[in-house]
Amino acid sequence: SEVGGPDAPVVLVGREAGSGTRDGFESIVGVEDACVYEQELTSTGAVMAAVAANPNAFGYVSLSAVDDTVKMVTVDGVEASEATVQDGSYKIQRPFIFVTKDGEELSAQAQAFVDFATSDAASDLIAGAGAVPLA
């Protein structure tokens, strides 16, 4: 009841240690290796199912995985959406970057991949998969 809900313990549901999703979430919110999860699960689907089954559960998943079995949480009054992720106003998000060996020029094939990955065609594929494309 201290956080506005029923008088019941909050059940924190997360991914297993070593999960990229868990590492990303914990680093974004600044709690690396400090969370104590009631349930540590091995898939996004399992996290969503556990949260959907318990009104006192709280978990984290990728925006692209959210369906109508769970409710997204607003952060600082901002709802999660493609637009709020792209403009940076939804604070719980993680960017991905391309990397290559330091001091080396990209090969023609690697440059072709980067060109495609940053193209409108790739953005359409990314959006079609339910993820947030480049802004």
Descriptions of predicted regions:
Residues 1-135:
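Exported/periplasmic ABC-transporter solute-binding proteins
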